[in-house]
Regions:
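Short amphipathic alpha-helix that is part of the acyltransferase structural core
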Residues: 1-30, 142
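A short helix-loop-beta-strand connector motif used in the catalytic cores of GNAT acetyltransferases and
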Residues: 35-45, 102
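Conserved beta-hairpin
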Residues: 41-56
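A conserved beta-turn-beta hairpin within the catalytic core of GNAT-like acetyltransferases
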Residues: 60-68, 78, 100, 126
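Conserved acetyl-CoA pyrophosphate-binding loop and the N-cap/start of the following alpha-helix
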Residues: 77, 81-89
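Conserved GNAT acetyl-CoA-binding A-motif
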Residues: 94-108
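Conserved catalytic-core motifs of GNAT/GCN5-like acyltransferases
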Residues: 101, 105, 117, 122-141
Length: 142
């Protein structure tokens, strides 16, 4: 893994679909994958000889609201510091892009909160914000 590079570039729809499958996330079609990739504010990848090993994406309005939507490393490579490399790039992007008072949000999988805490994130139940909420299944559209 000596040739692993961090590259600020979009991923392909096929890569997005493949990594969702690796994570056990619900399947999305190619059109949906293309749209979500195109709408990202920022994407950073880990690649070795052109092969995707992981990626992170940020979505939002690019000024005041930023949501870290994915920080995904191939399961075989977890624990090797690759997620940290991705997040370091995300944090640098946010420093360049976010205005004073911006809201930067991440919704980690249960048990992964400490990963984000090392980058300064706090759990929402700190008294200022509620615990955070989501719409299960997102069945607003087929």
């Amino acid at each position: 893994m000596a040739n692993v590079v961090v590259v600020e570039e979009a991923i392909t729809a096929a890569e997005f679909i493949e990594f969702r499958k690796l994570m056990g996330s619900p399947h999305v079609d190619s059109e949906t994958a293309r749209k979500t990739i195109a709408n990202a504010l920022y994407t950073v990848c880990l690649r070795e000889d052109g092969h995707l090993l992981g990626f992170a994406r940020v979505v939002g309005d690019g000024v005041l609201y930023f949501y870290i939507s994915d920080v995904i490393v191939h399961p075989a490579l977890r624990g090797g510091g690759y997620g940290i490399r991705l997040m370091n790039s995300v944090v640098e992007y946010l420093k360049r892009s976010a205005r004073a008072g911006a809201m930067v949000v991440v919704v980690p999988l249960a048990g992964r909160e400490s990963f984000y805490e090392r980058f300064g994130f706090r759990q929402c139940s700190d008294g200022r914000f509620g615990a955070g909420m989501y719409l299960p299944g997102c069945t607003l559209r087929p």
